Amino acid sequence: TALLLGEVALEAGVPPGGLNVLPCENQIAERLVVDPRFKLLSFTGSAAVGWRLKEKCGKKKVVLELGGNAGVIIEPDADLDFAAQRCATGGFGYAGQTCISVQRILVHHSIADLFTTKLLLQVARLKGGDPSDEGTVVGPLIDHKAADRVEQWIAEAVAQGARVLL
């Protein structure tokens, strides 16, 4: 995905060298982190590795996406029907338990109400049940501990002002 982002940046007119995507092994990454020629570090991955890299960055700007909180950004010019369908299946398929499940949706304020309506319609259409049954999209959580964790997240969100919509 990161390599594709680099290709898209070039196609969009970012000059060569303006954005560098450097997938590499740990030893090389750590040398790049301390190299003063690089002004920004962007890292997606585990919290343990991200915080270790941040400690080594010194005064560089750092953007960390840690712990698997896969985010989706919905802009006003997006195909909202397509985005709502993909966010619904991406967030609820396999009960949201894969490392690439949609866990956050960032929506431009000008389309937030419309997108929310479309997303709720898509989520309501998802079939829940036994994962071995054909057509089931939303199966059970893996164990009681996982269910308790989800209930805790919901309670925390509500305590901070969120509303349960479905």
Name the predicted role of every residue range.
Residues 29-32, 148:
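Short, solvent-exposed polar/charged micro-motifs at secondary-structure junctions
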Residues 3, 30-31, 51, 155:
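Alpha-helical segments flanking ligand/cofactor-binding loops in enzyme cores
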Residues 12-13, 33-40:
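Short, surface-exposed connector motifs at secondary-structure boundaries
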Residues 18, 40, 46-166:
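ALDH superfamily catalytic-core signature
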Residues 1-29:
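PLP-dependent aminotransferase-like
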Residues 2-3, 35, 151:
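Conserved strand-to-helix beginnings and helix N-cap segments that scaffold or border functional pockets
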